[in-house]
């Protein structure tokens, strides 16, 4: 069992299987919500959303993370699922040759799982081959170091998350065709150095 769904007539909770019985932690029991973050407790709503097929398969197969830092399986909260799914769907539907791509943003508060959401989005895009490179840019060294550590802890054993010690290493990884160089964590400063060295 990877995910538990517990229901009463008035409430539904779902959570990843933490392993042993003494590892169950109420902090990781979540209410499923719709796209507008309205909680769904009604069993019919849960049956047609959370535990429907293919949604249940997708949640288990694509939206769980075996976190190496604490050895616990984690499942994404509903808003994380919707964010990661929307990002990867947008990338898969983008017509890259038209040159009209626009950026976007996902707004999460402190402690809401931004790093896991960004990692899962990056992983889904990388695994789908919808982009040659997936680059996670940070604006400061501490955030880059922490994000790299968490990305590596979230990654499957057959995935590699690349660090960039300097601009030259970043440029080398960007030019590389190696599958191991698909997912990269780097800084805005290193990326802008490449642009400056390239002449704009």
Model region roles, listed by residue range:
Residues 193-195:
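Short, solvent-exposed loop/turn elements at domain surfaces
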